[in-house]
């Protein structure tokens, strides 16, 4: 099923205007992951209409333009639309990218991929399920959503990949040279997880184990932080953590794990 040709101006945007903080190359780690992930590439390549939406691009469209350039290495005829709920941030199109007003309703578009970075972080945790549901219901068949968070310089990043059935994976990615240990990413977890980093929760168990593996891999430090992390990741796999295999050399330290391994535990009724 092809995506809508253009945003529908008569649809009322769903969401709240957020701070809009952005910066050049801030989302590069997420872009690199999208451009090399097998599932994302398969959906983009097989889409009748390869439409990608960057939801909530902020005060500047620079990261939308960067994403478009990186994803066009996967499919050159990719269509990209940047959506902003703040009408004052909507800018004229450039470099083959269109910009329009829109929120979680996606302005009536039917994209195969939506990137929402540093958007839901500014909402309460209780708002996440409905926001996910609204976005996912607007995707084209087989569509994907990337819900991510990062720091101001893009050195510490985390994102969840979802389809219409719900979350599929969690990825943590960080600058090998400025992050001391994996748990430093805790403050940049997506909203669905950031308040669950407490003892007994799966995400806390993962981060604690990752720090321990990182410490045990200290003898490899002379070979650099990337080599040290590769060994630490192998230790995590040996302990039963189902980390996705690393199939190429990465400039980032990174782990991707099935959502089932980190999903929040159900709240216990009082």
Which residues fall in each region the model found?
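A short SAM/SAH-binding and catalytic strip from SAM-dependent methyltransferases
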Residues: 110-129
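Class I SAM-dependent methyltransferase Rossmann-like catalytic core
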Residues: 1-50, 54, 59-61
């Amino acid at each position: 099923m092809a995506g809508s040709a253009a945003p529908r101006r008569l649809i009322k945007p769903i969401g709240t205007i957020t701070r809009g903080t952005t910066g050049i190359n801030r989302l590069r780690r997420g872009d690199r992951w999208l451009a090399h992930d097998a599932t994302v590439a398969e959906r983009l390549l097989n889409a009748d209409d390869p439409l990608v939406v960057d939801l909530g691009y902020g005060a500047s469209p620079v990261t939308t333009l960067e994403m478009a350039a990186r994803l066009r290495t996967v499919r050159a005829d990719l269509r990209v639309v940047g959506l902003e709920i703040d009408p004052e941030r909507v800018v004229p199109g450039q470099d083959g990218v269109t910009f329009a007003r829109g929120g979680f309703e996606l302005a009536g578009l039917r994209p195969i991929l939506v990137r929402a970075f540093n958007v839901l972080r500014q909402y309460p945790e209780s708002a996440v399920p409905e926001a996910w549901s609204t976005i996912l219901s607007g995707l084209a068949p087989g569509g994907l959503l990337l819900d991510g968070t990062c720091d101001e310089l893009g050195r510490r990043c985390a994102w969840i990949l979802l389809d219409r059935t719900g979350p599929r994976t969690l990825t943590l990615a960080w600058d090998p040279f400025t992050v001391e240990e994996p748990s430093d990413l805790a403050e940049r977890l997506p909203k669905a997880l950031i308040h669950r980093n407490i003892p007994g929760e799966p995400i806390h168990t993962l981060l604690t184990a990752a720090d321990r593996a990182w410490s045990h891999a200290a003898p490899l430090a002379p070979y650099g932080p990337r080599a040290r992390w590769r060994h630490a990741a192998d230790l995590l796999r040996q302990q039963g953590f189902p980390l996705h295999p690393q199939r190429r050399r990465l400039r980032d330290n990174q782990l991707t794990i099935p959502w089932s391994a980190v999903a929040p535990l159900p709240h216990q009724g009082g």
